[in-house]
Amino acid sequence: MTTKRKETRESVCYREIKKKIRNGELKPGDRLIENTLSQQLEISRTPIRKAIGMLAADGYIEYNDFRGAIVKDSIINKERYFEMTEILGLFLKQAIHKIRTKKITFNKLEMTNKLAEIKNQEHQEHPLVYFDYEKWFAQNLLTYLKNNYYLKISEDFFNNIKEFGDEEVIKIAQNASVKTIDNIQNFIDAMDVHDYDKCLNLIDDLIDAHVLVAYR
């Protein structure tokens, strides 16, 4: 029989302070005062100090020379999310343009095999499965640019949505990613016959889907 591991005081502080940031109780620019948090959480200052350091490492908090630890403007709302998806869409279309102009051979088999893997996962109800596959699709396409800068931005985009997206953004991303997966076969077929204009239009459709899902 497995025993449940006891949560440390630092992890309790981390979880509770993070919750306050994500629900807006602690807003961007607010100072994190150890004494105040200690009283609110009924925990000594030492684990609170450690938790603040952990939150800083995760991007929720930054240190100011004059004000100490303050809440960063890290939470991704709907408007910021749409801006990020537009940028990602531009990168993906740039990859298609490069495949077209440089006459690069598209690895159809790799994407087809991945699509088969996705189909085998359809019984899973958790929408994050599809979000992870959408990330794979974007990363795979961006490899044709042969530029780690684009890959890093794409990687950060998907990771930041998971970590910093507000509740509305997470739902939009998950629902829109299902539409992306539904269109992968269309993308493969278009690439196979060198119909690059259709591929570009499909990317536009995928980006637009994020907006349409939000206002459904």
Model-predicted segments: where are they?
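Contiguous, function-dense segments enriched for cysteine-driven chemistry
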Residues: Q40, A56, K78, K135, ...
